[in-house]
């Protein structure tokens, strides 16, 4: 059993990033192997880690166990029996009056995530920072923060007791102003979250709601997203200084969420004690409503105004919600004034989001706004190859090119198609070939081919530029007609399976060289002209529905 685990750990260490290996694999330990039942039990130090490893790595570990013992092995994950002894404080829940109000936007965390009192959170964070900075002053910092924690807990106990039942599901792990400032002052560049104990690292992920798998290392970069990635890295290296706020926009499944999680994960690794929060805009709206109903706005504001990095996803969901927008405006102003970083995503350019207050739009425009475009062919192929590699599947490049050529809209669609191919191949016991891929994706390819036609592209483009559809076929050459016609040709080449001669025929019998010239011209200008790039983005999203 131990020989297997050494073999398994060595393989996983080579396959995963150092951060992933140290965080998820290193804390595991094999505890039993039942040869009669072919069952292997692996212990995890806590429930959070157990659930994550089970969902992400159980299949790979089972495959390695099968190869090692030359038979199917049932891999079971259990809690380390010693875990309870390492955390005695968690055994006795605090009385209701001493529990903190709960965090807005708790997204599936364990039930015990908010079990520590508010001030203890500040003490832990500052103590982590003090230890990472060196032993000098660590004891004093801890003593001072413990005193502050006790005072804060006593001061707020009566007020919170009355509201404890009503605000329990807000889960606000807040600090008072002094604690937040103390935690912020104790940061040192280069302090790594990974150097803390495993329990502390888990707690950071639970509080921040970050997905530790979404990092810069596994983000596939191409022309469509290279500017966004460069801006994200710059912000991760200089939070609150470079590009504040950073506003990323683009269609569904293009990597916006991946990038902002990558920023959060990088900062969490670089600065111990960083107060980071990822939240979807819908959850933020829900928490504003709960805070209003439970009269818990003081806790709500204290929590959000003391963050060091706020990552808010899909802010278009704020549309028409004036109270939410007002609260977010105040939080935004407080964070920027404190040199905290704000990062926002949307499916639309800021000025085109309907129902958003002009004050917020102007704040969004005050930083850096970057579009993420649908991935180009080479990038789509790279995404498929990377995803197949992560699933430990050998994917022929011809198959990847076939899928990438036919599915153009976003990364999620590509990954979903690959999962479908893998399942089809496994179920039928057939090697993954182009023929198998066509069978697996038959319905999806039919829908794709039916969705966008050259005729629809011509009509949509003509409407967008206020010309007649007939102008698409005519021989007229004024700039206000020729330009939209070239754009429509470019979109026809990008969004359909038509050949250049076929496209030329549908544009009034034009030669294929005319179409090729238009495609190359628009593609070149798109990379240099932000306005044209934005117009094409709008047209593509309209055509894809």
Curated annotation (Swiss-Prot):
Signal peptide: none annotated. Residues 209-425 are annotated as: Domain III, AAA+ region. PROSITE patterns: DNAA. It comes from the Bacteria. One of its GO terms (biological process) is DNA replication initiation. Residues 189-201 have a biased composition (Polar residues). ATP binds at residues 253, 255-257. Residues 90-105 have a biased composition (Low complexity). One of its GO terms (cellular component) is cytoplasm. GO terms for molecular function: ATP binding; ATP hydrolysis activity; DNA replication origin binding; lipid binding. Residues 426-545 are annotated as: Domain IV, binds dsDNA. SUPFAM superfamilies: P-loop containing nucleoside triphosphate hydrolases (SSF52540), TrpR-like (SSF48295). Residues 90-112, 181-204 are annotated as: Disordered. Disulfide bonds: none annotated. Plays an essential role in the initiation and regulation of chromosomal replication. ATP-DnaA binds to the origin of replication (oriC) to initiate formation of the DNA replication initiation complex once per cell cycle. Binds the DnaA box (a 9 base pair repeat at the origin) and separates the double-stranded (ds)DNA. Forms a right-handed helical filament on oriC DNA; dsDNA binds to the exterior of the filament while single-stranded (ss)DNA is stabiized in the filament's interior. NCBIfam families: DnaA. This is Chromosomal replication initiator protein DnaA.
